[in-house]
């Protein structure tokens, strides 16, 4: 948000002549906006020109106050302004109210970001006889998107059979994202083994409870889970067990599959590689580097 505001401020500053000797009307408009007086803010901003008007409009749309027509008009008029993804997310309710054509148009190229948007988009796709696209959107959202218990129930009520094979994958992804409430919402939908694994991972992430007992109680099929190993590694780092953390990371650095989500390890791997650059643990550094090309994207090579 701060980066978007800073960029927008620069855009505005470059678009208008400087008058340092007196306050700009945009400043007064921003004050009115912060007070909740959106209409007054827009009127005041007109005194500062078209860019100032759109600065206020940008804020208003990002607050979820725009109609479908206002949102699409702004996006076509200011396609290069920052924060578009958030503006689009905040506008999904207005898009849904507009009906199927608007939904299909708006989400072409940039899919929905909210559970409600995903469900509405899928429904519109189904009514347009685009079954494959609808199912792909639903499964992707189910496997990746955090959502409330109410939204989760809506997904299951509407598309339960389609989503059932992906319950364990959703639980796993919520744990990678450290979305503990969303993970716990899945407990009744997965196996006892998956639930036990999730409880161990949550305890590790929270530095909570007897993690060794939880890990020891896991069935053999879950003991080598990549997400569990990532959480064990992070737990050791945070607890100050650096040497054993390095050993664990080395044991997982044999393939991308063993890491589970290589990007989740990347920062720690780079940090440890920098530490090892002194040569005090040169063999370990060489071993990790040997596996890096298999495990990380090119930008993550150590």
Language model features with spans:
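Alpha-helical solenoid repeat scaffolds
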Residues: 5, 10, 20-302
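Hydrophobic membrane-targeting alpha-helices
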Residues: 13-17
């Amino acid at each position: 948000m701060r980066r978007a505001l800073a960029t927008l401020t620069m855009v505005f500053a470059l678009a208008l002549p400087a008058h340092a000797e007196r306050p700009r009307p945009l400043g007064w408009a921003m004050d009115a906006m912060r007070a909740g007086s959106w209409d007054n803010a827009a009127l005041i901003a007109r005194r500062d020109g078209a860019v100032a008007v759109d600065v206020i409009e940008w804020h208003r749309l990002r607050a979820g106050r725009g109609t479908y027509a206002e949102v699409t008009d702004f996006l076509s008029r200011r396609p290069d302004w920052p924060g578009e993804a958030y503006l689009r997310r905040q506008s999904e309710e207005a898009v849904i109210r507009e009906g199927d054509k608007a939904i299909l148009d708006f989400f072409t190229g940039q899919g929905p970001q909210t559970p409600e948007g995903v469900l509405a988009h899928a429904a519109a796709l189904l009514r347009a006889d685009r079954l494959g696209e609808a199912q792909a959107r639903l499964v992707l959202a189910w496997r990746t998107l955090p959502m409330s218990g109410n939204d989760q129930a809506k997904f299951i009520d509407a598309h339960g059979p389609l989503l059932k094979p992906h319950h364990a994958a959703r639980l796993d992804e919520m744990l990678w994202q450290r979305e503990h409430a969303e993970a716990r919402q899945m407990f009744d939908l997965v196996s006892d083994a998956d639930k036990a694994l999730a409880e161990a991972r949550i305890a590790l992430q929270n530095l909570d409870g007897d993690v060794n007992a939880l890990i020891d109680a896991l069935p053999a099929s879950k003991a080598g889970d990549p997400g569990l190993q990532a959480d064990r590694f992070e737990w050791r780092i945070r607890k100050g067990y650096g040497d054993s953390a390095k050993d664990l990371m080395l044991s997982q650095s044999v393939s991308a599959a063993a890491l589970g989500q290589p990007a989740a390890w990347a920062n720690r791997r780079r940090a440890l590689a920098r530490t090892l650059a002194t040569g005090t643990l040169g063999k370990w550094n060489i071993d990790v580097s040997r596996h890096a090309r298999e495990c990380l994207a090119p930008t993550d090579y150590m």
